Amino acid sequence: MTTRNLDKLASIDAQLRQLVPAKVSEDDKLVEYDALLLDRFLDILQDLHGEDLKETVQECYELSAEYEAKHDPKKLEELGNVLTSLDPGDSIVIAKAFSHMLNLANLAEEVQIAYRRRQKLKKKGDFGDESNATTESDIEETFKKLVGDLKKSPQEVFDAIKNQTVDLVLTAHPTQSVRRSLLQKHGRIRDCLAQLYAKDITPDDKQELDEALQREIQAAFRTDEIRRTPPTPQDEMRAGMSYFHETIWKGVPKFLRRVDTALKNIGINERVPYNAPLIQFSSWMGGDRDGNPRVTPEVTRDVCLLARMMAANLYYSQIEDLMFELSMWRCNEELRVRADDLQRSSRRDEKHYIEFWKQVPPNEPYRVILGDVRDKLYQTRERARQLLGHGYSEIPEEATYTNIEQFLEPLELCYRSLCACGDLSIADGSLLDFLRQVSTFGLSLVRLDIRQESDRHTDVLDAITQHLEIGSYRDWSEERRQEWLLSELSGKRPLFGPDLPKTEEIADVLDTFHVIAELPADCFGAYIISMATAPSDVLAVELLQRECRVRQPLRVVPLFEKLADLDAAPAAVARLFSIEWYRNRINGKQEVMIGYSDSGKDAGRLSAAWQLYKAQEELIQVAKEFDVKLTMFHGRGGTVGRGGGPAHLAILSQPPETIHGSLRVTVQGEVIEQSFGEEHLCFRTLQRFTAATLEHGMHPPVSPKPEWRALMDEIAVVATEKYRSIVFKEPRFVEYFRLATPELEYGRMNIGSRPSKRKPSGGIESLRAIPWIFAWTQTRFHLPVWLGFGAAFKYAIEKDIKNLRMLQEMYNAWPFFRVTIDLVEMVFAKGDPGIAALFDKLLVSEDLWSFGELLRSKYEETKSLLLQIAGHKDLLEGDPYLKQRLRLRDSYITTLNVCQAYTLKRIRDPDYSVTPRPHISKEYMEAKPATELVNLNPTSEYAPGLEDTLILTMKGIAAGMQNTG
């Protein structure tokens, strides 16, 4: 310990109480929750690693807090000296402790949000939601607003809600920094904390919960946070599917009941039909092969069978509860006849069930029917298990459910019979919930989208045309390609046989189509073509599906993401719709995906957001001309730089008429945990998406005035030029980026199954959008989010001072512009150029220091212009909740930032000398529990402990920032 007077060192807990803003409202329990978790954790830290280490944690925290108060860079240096003087084991423990404390702060927040939500529901009042500066409506408020304020009839609301669809597409983007083992422990900590503050808790309950809390915090701290091997796509799929087990499976029927209740409260005495497609789930895990060589046809087959097995297992685990519930003897004639037939034909085979294992008596007809459903579910599950394990199954396909209609039929029969016998209230119990689950999840739990780059299809067709000796498809013009594709699609002859010469890549593409042909059609959703530019890209996939004998072809979805592609998208889609063969094929429905990540990386956030807005307007116009219903599929990331931010705000700021009751949106990486990690979060996510989609359709946001459009067009050009002049044209930029951020070390984190680069060599262009953002988030500089905004606003205001008033008017009256600015403001609130300056000082060569200073001056300039336009004196002045939450975690994050900067220095500069603490002899070191941590990574090529310390800081900062990639 340094010579600072220990007696004067305040505990973190006391520090917190001084630091934290006052309670934001009466029902604000965040500080209490946070302090309780911290107290418990510090006790555990002392027990496991001794008092010295606990005091070092407190010293680091205090120095960070002092820095946060005055932003004095000397404090960062002092903190750096404390951190670099630690031996390798202690250094890992400190990084682990701060990372852990940030995870605990997140859990305290989630419990606080749930608590305030319950308080709100008790009072039936409205409140500004805490995760953004705008009020979020629940489903009941949305209905009342539509009927009361906007004078829609209850019937109109009912018709709109039962015909709308929100399809949430879970993707395994490599940003879920927390291991599944830890997510489960975090869930239990959350539960303990929520129960500890329940009103009716007894002293004994309290004591037991406190012990459980201590146990779970210790178990989480004792779990290795670092993945020692990269996850496979199957691992990612299993991780994604675990949310269905934990929350989504039960959450969907519970949410739909709330919709029923809300309808009742506006005078509609009907329930949402059980087959109304309100919520759907899809997945990219194991289907997204764009730039991921690890997603092979075998992987796709595996994840589909795995999902079918999980779905059958979930239904199977619930069917006996339903059999218990439906014990009635009275039924209609149709059901009686069916039950009698089953009784006669059933010979009990050797399956030993726990309940209803003997033949069900004939006076329980519903149980007879459901017993047969149970048998089939058992066979369905076992067949999928055998196919997954051995590639074949002894169970014949006809003994299982192969499509959803077969599965629904006996359940619908039970429902009709109960209604006919006057037992409607019983029919609307668990049976209705079960029917709704079947309609939502089907037999495959989620539908798997396939994504592939357009070039890979071109390679296959080029091989075919060369084999047929009719030329090189790759060299043909677009017209020639279309002509040939359409003549083949209109004809009947097969294009190629088994003698087609195939490279490994070509075989991979064709085998993927064969897997689609082999598995049941309900396993799959869309076939998405990335880097799509022309109608031939779509027709190529249609032809390959036909050639590989896909009986029910997947809908083909072009994905437009770069700025130029977005600009050309409406014309490309119009050309596609003008092809008669294609119009007949799609039956008046088309889906188009727009990508937020690459457009942001290509042109900066402001221009990307505006281009995405305009492209959607134009695409909808094209679809109207051809009388096609267009569904927009939004590929949003978790971070603001990749189109992230609160979901309902994003929806309500889309252009009018672009959602129209059908929305598809990706839920990525760590956002899955924030959306579905816990029951109330799942409920809230389903509610937000449904309410916002309904409101957007029935009460569209305003269209921008012509003068707003003109100004946006003008400033977007300036923003793009400024962004590209720095990111792509400035010769010093790539070197600066690699030195000033942990981008080069990112690959060591084993976060995802996908490589972080599209091509092994190359500059910023080849870097994926995710590591690009992740790296800047780590240094709290967030460059991709704000770069370009300042130059654009400065240009507009200098050109004509009236433009400042116009920008302020746009902020106040136009949801799209407001949301864009608010999200950047939130990122500024999380940023800190002082931290970026420390990284520069330690890691960047001196000749680049002036470049770093230039970027930081642009950061400050952009921030002040942004506040001027929003009419705010301080960042987040309109959102006290978020401000409080960010202040609470700043000191933890700062310690990790400093730790990361100095660790990178030691990794990159082996000659960097540090002064180790005196009096830690080798024998003493080996006896310390902390040294065991160094041995977890025996193969590291760096000095002991450095690599693990670095990875732990990355994970901790990711947890603190909450939207990492």
Swiss-Prot record:
Major enzyme class: lyase
- Where does the record place it? Cytoplasm
Its needed co-factors are: Mg(2+)
The EC number on file is 4.1.1.31
**Major location, coarse class?**
cytoplasm
- Write down the InterPro entries for this protein, in alphabetical order: PEP_COase (IPR021135), PEP_COase_bac/pln-type (IPR022805), PEP_COase_Lys_AS (IPR018129), PEPCASE_His_AS (IPR033129), Pyrv/PenolPyrv_kinase-like_dom (IPR015813)
Q: According to its record, what are the GO cellular component terms?
A: cytosol
Q: Which domain of life is it from?
A: Eukaryota
Q: What is this protein called?
A: Phosphoenolpyruvate carboxylase
Query: Which family does the similarity line name?
Result: Belongs to the PEPCase type 1 family.
Q: Gene encoding it?
A: PPC1
What does its activity-regulation comment describe?
Answer: By light-reversible phosphorylation.
State the organism named in the record: Solanum tuberosum (Potato)
Positions where Phosphoserine occurs in the chain: 11
Reaction catalyzed: oxaloacetate + phosphate = phosphoenolpyruvate + hydrogencarbonate
* Metabolic or biological pathway: Photosynthesis; C3 acid pathway
